[in-house]
Amino acid sequence: MEISGRLINSTPDDNSILYWSNVSTHVDENYQIIFPQNTEFGTFHCKEYFCHWPITTEAFRGVEEYKHGLDASWWKNHPVSNSIFAHNLKEDFIAGYDHGKNAGTMLAGNHHISKGGKFWTWGPNSEWDTKILTENAGHYIELMTGAYSDNQPDYSWLKTNELKTFTQYYYGIRDIGGGKK
């Protein structure tokens, strides 16, 4: 699927912008979050907390379990709900892959424009998402990409009458064991 965006400021004042798109997908213990191999760090909203990626060696957001070598690329390992952004994204994709189903989703776009890549999860220990947000679908994760911003709420700006454009692609992937570069 191709998403082409046009952000236009038709006002007489400079204005902030924040664009993020979201793909939600079912997750279980076989699901892996894939950031490019050269991603060294993850960060939380506002770049307030950082962790090594994919193996964390520090408490993240005050959660001690993350400092014991937790592999944060696996959904099953997150002890709490969490949001992790790929810090300083240098490639044109992020992905998620269910190794049990041999299928996943890849989000792609020019990383100089689509600067942000992240995931949000309620985590495997939460029942809130399964009771409130779905009828019987089980746990899910949100893979997200941002244009002109690498974090939330890290705004970008549009000058008066300025136009910014971007193109992002969402791919279904199958039988490739994930993704890397």
Tell where the protein language model's regions lie, with residue ranges.
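Generic beta-strand structural signal
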Residues: 1-5, 31
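Short Pro-Gly-centered flexible turn/kink motifs
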Residues: 2-3, 156-174
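Beta-strand elements of well-folded, non-transmembrane domains
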Residues: 7-11, 147, 170-174
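A contiguous, surface-exposed recognition patch within enzymatic or periplasmic domains that forms
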Residues: 10-162
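Charged, amphipathic alpha-helical linkers/stalks
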Residues: 173-181
